[in-house]
A protein has these predicted regions:
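Mature catalytic core of soluble alpha/beta enzymes
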Residues: 1-347
Length: 347
């Protein structure tokens, strides 16, 4: 299995093997097999670049608009969740591809060609794709039966996509690891493995530990000026799902999702279906919940993070749904969690 492409390089699983009174070696081996199988399957399901024999994946759905496809329950649930949340950003596939080109550029002049804020053609394209993405008559998902998905795409959008050479209408892009971490976590938990924590390099965490016997840590960083500063560590008990919205590059998966111009201007992956451009309300926002997975937590808070600025009132509303927030104002930590616990960094 080790040689097969999988999504595990983006994630770290830490597990307290042997704690349940069974052989540590045997438990580690069994857990490793389950986890690796899930990592291979997850990689395939959410892939937009190629097809695989054993699954119907996102690539297949993109290649067969207006056809009913039967998909794995994991992908069905992910698409249904995004659709139910009315998160139209899933339909910005062509603009995510363009953003990747921008972020992989070697210099500002090359990057600017893909930037709707700096290039007329790019601006025109962003506006066109956003207009299609906003309109359910142009693109939408239907779920006609159990694990069945149909991606409806209008003739007008198909013609435009063909003219522009697009290959993917649908792409989870920066949201993908939230759905993958939930799948990995739910898979091992379903097999009875609960004394573990999975984290992704781009800031998602699923802590499965329900014992309440162990304290876990999550680092708090804040971009102040052009310097990312450590502000200490949030302490928490499981189970928890943590989502980290950030307007700067934080981990290795971010290299092809963020770009910093020489003047300090950042481009981020948080594109909005309203105009096809990136929007961030603050340099960072951490949201977490003991009730929901990462995907639900992300979808509940995403629109708040895309606002002009963070609204304490809206974040309080989230807290009433048991989704808590941590953010910064004037370099001071703010939170909606009455039980928030953290250890400050020694300055």
């Amino acid at each position: 299995m080790g040689s097969e492409l999988n999504c595990s390089e983006d994630f770290t699983l830490k597990y307290n093997v042997g704690a349940g009174g069974v052989s540590a070696g045997g438990e580690a081996k069994a857990l490793s097999l389950i986890y690796t199988d899930a990592a291979v399957k997850g990689y395939r399901l959410f892939n937009i670049d190629e097809s695989f024999d054993d699954v119907t994946n996102l690539y297949d759905i993109n290649q067969h608009p207006n056809e009913v496809m039967t998909v794995d329950p994991v992908l069905y649930d992910a698409l249904k969740k995004v659709s139910d949340a009315n998160c139209r950003e899933i339909y910005l596939g062509p603009l995510y591809a363009s953003l990747e080109n921008l972020c992989m550029s070697n210099d500002d002049a090359a990057a600017a060609q893909f930037d709707p804020e700096k290039d007329d053609d790019a601006a025109e394209e962003a506006a066109a794709v956003a207009a299609f993405a906003q309109n359910p008559d142009d693109i939408s998902m239907e779920f006609p039966g159990e694990n069945q998905v149909c991606l409806h795409v209008s003739d007008a959008y198909q013609a435009y996509a063909a003219e522009m050479g697009y290959t993917a209408y649908l792409d989870f892009f920066w949201m993908k690891n939230a759905f993958l971490i939930d799948y990995l976590a739910d898979t091992i938990r379903g097999e009875g493995y609960q004394l573990g924590i999975i984290s992704s390099k781009d800031g998602f965490v699923r802590c499965l530990d329900e014992t309440g016997e162990k304290e876990y840590q999550y680092p708090l960083y804040h971009l102040s000026g052009n310097e990312i500063q450590s502000h200490g560590t949030m302490m928490y008990e499981g189970p928890k799902s943590i989502v980290f919205f950030h307007a700067y590059q934080a981990g290795s998966p971010d290299t092809y999702r963020y770009y910093q111009y020489q003047d300090g201007t950042m481009r981020t992956p948080y594109l909005s279906a309203s105009d096809g451009k990136d929007h961030t309300a603050a340099s960072e926002l951490i949201v977490y919940s003991g009730e929901y997975g990462c995907a639900d937590t992300l979808l509940a808070a995403f629109f708040d993070y895309q606002a002009e600025s963070l609204s304490g009132e809206l974040l309080k509303t989230l807290a009433s749904q048991k989704i808590y927030s941590v953010w910064f104002e004037n370099n001071e930590i703010q939170t909606t969690d009455g039980k928030f616990s953290f250890t400050a960094v020694n300055k």
